[in-house]
Amino acid sequence: MIRPGAIGDLILSLPALESLQTGYFEVWVASRNASLVRFANRVRSIASTGLDLLGITDPPPSLIDSLSSFDSIISWYGANRPEFRELVGSLNLQFHFFPALPPETGTMHATDFYLDQVRDLCASTSDPIPRIPCDVPRENFAVIHPFSGSARKNWPLDKFRHLARGLQRAMPVRWCAGPDDPPLDGAVRIDDLYELARWLAGARLYVGNDSGITHLAAAVGTPVLALFGPTEPGVWAPRGPNVRVARWNR
């Protein structure tokens, strides 16, 4: 399984990845996401394999040997690159390509989109809710993460601060910044995503934008309020029994 993409993209596709487990099972992902894949026999970063060099320069023999050793390769990597698909075909590598993102005009939730892609290849049925196991006791604090991968998806910071003042009457509030987020005074910043997941799993409440960290909080079972602006929650909202979504506009 080769799954590029940001934090949220990986998390939304976890049910599809897990449904394909059979025999020996490797998952190749973006380096930062590797610690979030807990179910594979082996997890590798795409960069460490040399796959990103395939089609650009002569690939290392170890990469071709590794790819040739698999009976099947399910890839969201290179799906929109005809030259990459042609190259792996010429090498007789057993690739099955799938689009990495749902269509822009689509209405199907992203997790269902990924599950639907692999349905004919599934070794088992899968829970359509992304889950990352974290055995962490719940504590009495709220987390606010005011960032995302795009400024247009961010609820204004002053409104988050106003919300925090209200929440502080009920419980302590801790601010959170992800590994790629800008500086924020007093924010907890944990670079390892699984360790960040464990910290989020201890929160009584999480509030954030349409972001990978919001998907991470939902996947560990923390009660989540996800604030959506221009993106479509019907496609991109986090899933889980403890997730609530609110829409905002400026």
Pin down the residues of each PLM region.
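Catalytic machinery of carbohydrate-active enzymes
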Residues: 1-250
